[in-house]
Amino acid sequence: MLKQPKGLIAAALANTGERFGFYTMMAILTLFLMSKFGIDGEQAGKIYSFFYTSIYILALVGGLIADRLRNYKGTIIAGILVMTAGYAALMVPTVTSKTVVIGALMVIAFGNGLFKGNLQALVGQLYDNEQYAKLRDTGFQIFYMFINIGAMFAPFAAVGVRNWWLRTQGFLYNSDLSALCHQYIGGTMSPEVAQGRFSELAAEVSLGGVPADMGVFAQSYLNAFNTGFHYAFGVAIVALVFSLVVFLANKKKLPDPKVAAASRTTPSKAEIQQDAREIKQRLYALFAVFAIVIFFWFSFHQNGLTLTLFAQDYTRLEIFGMPITAEIFQSANPFCLVVLTPVII
């Protein structure tokens, strides 16, 4: 790391904070939507997919804005502030409208578009200096290792906040109870389940003793459960404040494309033609990469949707006799990346 340009660690730490906040949200988003609105995995998946589609589309918009303004650092700061506003909207427990939640997700997606790609562009420009050109690949591996450090701990933070709030309200966590509470309140629960499993679980999670009124219990547990989810989104705000402080304190270490462009000499006609041929070759290579990464991200982003639902519904949530939650499985992939990156480089 000591041989890398000075701005790399600063940029990596700023990205670590933002990714910590983002993956805190992604660890719980699907389960939050299902619990908050009483919807099934299919409906939650549509919102999840729409959100992720928006992230990738708005990343292009964020790049166009930064290119037009030639102010990458200002665009990055704006992205952090916009994302903070989106997470703040999700943090409010009184939000009951699905439209408001989707709107907040779109705000986060737009802020992400302003932030993520432009920060990575600045990291790439650190290696335009011939002194560091040979270290580019290693530098990006270090940069992405820092991203995964944030992603690795994020699910634990989300689960910790939710379960802490449940305890303050006199309840323990149970992955099945949210759906059962919705069934009881909606009148779709059979008498056998109401008098059997639902009553048994209610007694298990109630720290104050067996509930006298199951209707009151169902509403109280849902309120506490969903409020815990809302407060978990506040972790993202704290992480973004960290990112903002780190970025502002170190932004002079990062390149300024506007200054670099002003210092360039006017290229000759031959140089322009040569650059055009090189750009065309790079575009061909880029489209080849597109053909691969589309399927990679198609699979990867099942983490927050189908794999989370599979973990909750079809996995024994216990390790060495200790209970775990479905969200924790999302730490497995970044953990492997953090452990293996030093081996690779």
Where are these regions (language model features)?
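Central cavity-lining transmembrane alpha-helices of secondary-active solute carriers
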Residues: K46-R68, K116, M152-A154, S331-I344
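Loop-to-transmembrane helix entry
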Residues: I39-T53, L135-Q141, G228, L307, ...
